[in-house]
């Protein structure tokens, strides 16, 4: 099939270039800066908000919506006053991306909830990365726990999807997270690191990757994940990246929290040092609540 | 009454905004047989369904290439049957061989999808078909029967079902399916429906051919008594799709 629109591709490439410049600017200039204390690191992150350390809030609408409910939600989002220093992305179902792209403010970027593993062709029911670029979709969520555990996508399949999407200039929200039985067996980090390794084996340039930690163990199990538990995993993932990829990637990448986030708990979560934003589920379908979650970036600044 | 000829075009994972505009233009301007003679459905990727639906001439219907197995909710990446209904997309293709083989969809999963889609008011193109290995081991009818049984165990009303036979054994294997081979399976499948569902369902259900269909072979295939139309692949993206639609007139000749 034909290559994606050269205009869209070129535009996204330029965005990617700017982001890469941002990463370089934000990276520590000397090894000893890696030993900076916590408060200094937080201050540095605030200063670096113009780069890839910027707070990130994504809304995953999942398999929800009607033409009317989408229209109402878009109206609410368009009317909201959003803080400037936060990247905002919404992920409608495939079938509503056209409607959302045509009506949503361009302050908010659009993501797909999945994408095919390679070039388009004889793959009935799938959507390719080239098609996402063609329709103006900038992001894709990959490896979401519902696709891992309900659909049966394995780590390697997901890693290859991420590599292909990035190669087509689609930015990736890469999801990881462990089940309750895995957590209770003391395997939280083993599972998350294994999932991270599958991404790392496939990804060469992390500039356009955001990592989302989903505490699957607390989803629908009656357990509640505390901000401290979220922070613990985020810090461990960042350390893993530092050791297994590079210190530059570890410090520049956004690691966002994909557990239960709502207007009531977002400020507390945002204060955690290694929580760089959220991948919001049900609350992203409520315009005013989602706006409150987006604006919790101010809590990050207060904490710093 | 006789079975109305049915031509579905499965675009698969193809198309850009510009290409879609061109295809829709070809379809809108094409001279096609009347809706009394042929029912035409085209199936773009999800992301193009709204634009195709809004631009396509009303005589040609639109299908999704898949949908989720039950009510929508926490199923990231999926599109539910009720979403399709909400957008006035009347048809859905289910159980396509590419989803059975590449996405691991089982007979039971496909059967559940068909039942749920029908329950929400969608019409279904339900796909069945055997691989080369299965055909060469003499299992063609066993495989097709098992796939069809998984659907028939879950539904009562076949009014809104079209069955598509895909000779997977002849897709990308270098083998070519002849019209006689297509007819043999269609006849076997219709006999299976008569024996296992009812004579009425067997007589009224359209069984369409989902193998390689082109402008060159469509008329010969359409002439087969148990071939009630096509589920077209690559040719559905091309002007020759109009010729394939018009092969419907072979039935009334």
Curated annotation (Swiss-Prot), chain B:
CDD domains: TIM
Transmembrane segments annotated in the record for this chain: none
UniProt EC number: 5.3.1.1
Active site as annotated: 96, 166
The protein's annotated pathway: Carbohydrate biosynthesis; gluconeogenesis; Carbohydrate degradation; glycolysis; D-glyceraldehyde 3-phosphate from glycerone phosphate: step 1/1
Family matches, as Pfam families: TIM
Binding annotation for substrate: 10, 12
Keyword Isomerase annotated: yes
InterPro entries according to UniProt: Aldolase_TIM, TIM_sf, TrioseP_Isoase_bac/euk, Triosephosphate_isomerase, Triosephosphate_isomerase_AS
Record's GO cellular component terms: cytosol
Coiled-coil ranges (or none): none
Superkingdom, natural source: Eukaryota
Chief location bin: cytoplasm
PANTHER family, A to Z: TRIOSEPHOSPHATE ISOMERASE, TRIOSEPHOSPHATE ISOMERASE, CYTOSOLIC
Assembly behavior: Homodimer.
HAMAP family: TIM_B (MF_00147_B)
Entry's family note: Belongs to the triosephosphate isomerase family.
Name of the molecule in the record: Triosephosphate isomerase, cytosolic
Organism: Oryza sativa subsp. japonica
Organism taxonomic ancestry: Eukaryota, Viridiplantae, Streptophyta, Embryophyta, Tracheophyta
């Amino acid at each position: 099939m034909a290559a994606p629109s050269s205009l869209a591709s070129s535009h996204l490439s330029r965005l990617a270039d700017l982001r890469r410049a941002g990463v370089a600017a934000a990276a520590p200039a000397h090894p000893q800066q890696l030993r900076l204390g916590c408060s200094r690191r937080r201050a540095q992150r605030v200063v670096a908000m113009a780069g890839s350390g910027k707070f990130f809030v994504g809304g995953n609408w999942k398999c929800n919506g009607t033409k009317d409910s989408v229209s109402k939600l878009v109206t609410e989002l368009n009317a909201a006053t959003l803080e400037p220093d936060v990247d905002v992305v919404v992920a409608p179902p495939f079938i509503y991306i056209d409607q959302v792209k045509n009506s949503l403010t361009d302050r908010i970027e659009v993501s797909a909830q999945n994408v095919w593993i390679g070039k388009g062709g004889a793959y009935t029911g799938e959507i390719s990365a080239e098609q996402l670029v063609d329709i103006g979709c900038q992001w894709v969520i990959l490896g979401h726990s519902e696709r891992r555990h309900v659909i049966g996508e394995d780590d390697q399949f997901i890693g290859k999807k991420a590599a292909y999407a990035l190669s087509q200039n689609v930015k990736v929200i890469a999801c990881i997270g462990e089940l309750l039985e895995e957590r209770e067996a003391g395997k939280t980090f083993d599972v998350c690191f294994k999932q991270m390794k599958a991404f790392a084996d496939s990804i060469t340039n992390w500039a356009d990757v955001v990592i989302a930690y989903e505490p699957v163990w607390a989803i629908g199990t009656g357990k509640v994940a505390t901000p401290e538990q979220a922070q613990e995993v985020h810090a461990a993932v960042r350390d893993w990246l530092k050791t297994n990829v590079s210190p530059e990637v570890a410090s520049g990448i956004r690691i966002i929290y994909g557990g239960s986030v709502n207007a009531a708990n977002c400020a507390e979560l945002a204060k955690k040092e290694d929580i760089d934003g959220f991948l919001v589920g049900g609350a992203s379908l409520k315009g005013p609540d989602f706006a409150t979650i987006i604006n919790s970036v101010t809590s990050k600044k207060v904490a710093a | 009454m006789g079975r109305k000829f049915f031509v579905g075009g499965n675009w698969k994972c193809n198309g850009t905004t510009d290409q879609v505009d061109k295809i829709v233009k070809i379809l809108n301007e094409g001279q096609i047989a009347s809706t009394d003679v042929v029912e035409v459905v085209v199936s773009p990727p999800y992301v193009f369904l709204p634009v195709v639906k809004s631009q396509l001439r009303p005589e040609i219907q639109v299908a999704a290439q898949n949908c989720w197995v039950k009510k929508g909710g926490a199923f990231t990446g999926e599109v539910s049957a009720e979403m399709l209904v909400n957008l006035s997309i009347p048809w859905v293709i289910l159980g396509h061989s590419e989803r059975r083989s590449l996405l691991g969809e089982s007979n039971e999963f496909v059967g559940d999808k068909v039942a749920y889609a029908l329950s929400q008011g969608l019409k279904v193109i339900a796909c069945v078909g055997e691989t080369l290995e299965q055909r060469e081991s003499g299992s063609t009818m066993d495989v097709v029967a098992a796939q069809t049984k998984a659907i028939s165990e879950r539904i009562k009303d076949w009014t809104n079902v079209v069955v598509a036979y895909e000779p997977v054994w002849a897709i990308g294997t270098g083998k070519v399916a002849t019209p006689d081979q297509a007819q043999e399976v269609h006849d076997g499948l219709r006999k299976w429906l008569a024996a296992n569902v009812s004579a009425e369902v067997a007589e009224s259900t359209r069984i369409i051919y989902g193998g390689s269909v082109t402008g060159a072979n469509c008329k010969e295939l359409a002439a087969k008594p148990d071939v009630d139309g096509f589920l077209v692949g690559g040719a559905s993206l091309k002007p020759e799709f109009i010729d394939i639609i018009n092969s419907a007139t072979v039935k009334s000749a």
